[in-house]
Amino acid sequence: MLFLVLGKGKTGSLVADVARERGHGVRAMDIDENAGAGALNGPTLSGVDAVIDFTAPEAAVENMRAVLALGGRVVVGTTGWYAHLDAMKSIAELRNGSLLYGTNFSIGVQKLFRLTAEVARLDDYQFSITETHHTTKLDAPSGTAITLKEIIQSVRPGIEVPITSHRKGDAKGEHIVTAKSEHDVLELRHDAHSRRAFAIGAVRGAEWLAHQAPGVWDFREVFDRL
């Protein structure tokens, strides 16, 4: 397969490396090489099985709009753009494009989501979330923390779930879900030691997306089909 990776930062570079290791062809563009998604045209996307985006929220929206409008396939690991999700779904449906997005492409975090849904069923517990990331992460709270909160509230409607965010050094990503009762405390924790986990999930997602009919999927829905 041939993948076009958008973003040459730490995670984007790892995505390109992982894709090559898995035997795929890779082309890569940095944000400056694709200002306003201007480089995402028919000739650029010709022969590309999927685009993988790890850029920034505003750039990701422009990139998705361009790729989906051409009926292309795009995997988006960038977070912080979800206010535009309905618009992206509409473009994908209109132009027969394909979108796979997720607040976190780590398989371990996907398991954390499922465990959180199970723990949220406990009665008489109060829940809170703490997340820590590197100082260059643009969105706070993280998309993963927001997803964890949404999972808890889907099981326990109306419950308050405070999120505490920290930005420290080059932290790869730590999420802690705390369930506290009058009698005890239960914690679920995922601590990323390397961005490679996100890269592997994104590439596996792109491999999966390349074989699907047009549509829009959340990584949470498909990760165990990869």
What do the PLM-derived regions correspond to, one by one?
Residues 2-6, 10-45, 58, 123-226:
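C-terminal substrate-binding/catalytic lobe of Rossmann-fold NAD(P)-dependent oxidoreductases
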Residues 26, 74-75, 98-99:
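Hydrophobic beta-strand scaffold residues
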Residues 41-50, 54-78, 86-88, 93:
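Rossmann-fold NAD(P) dinucleotide-binding segment
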Residues 65, 78-100, 107-110, 114-119:
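Rossmann-fold NAD(P)-binding glycine/threonine-rich loop
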Residues 101-109, 134-141:
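Short, surface-exposed loop/turn motifs that are enriched in glycine and acidic residues
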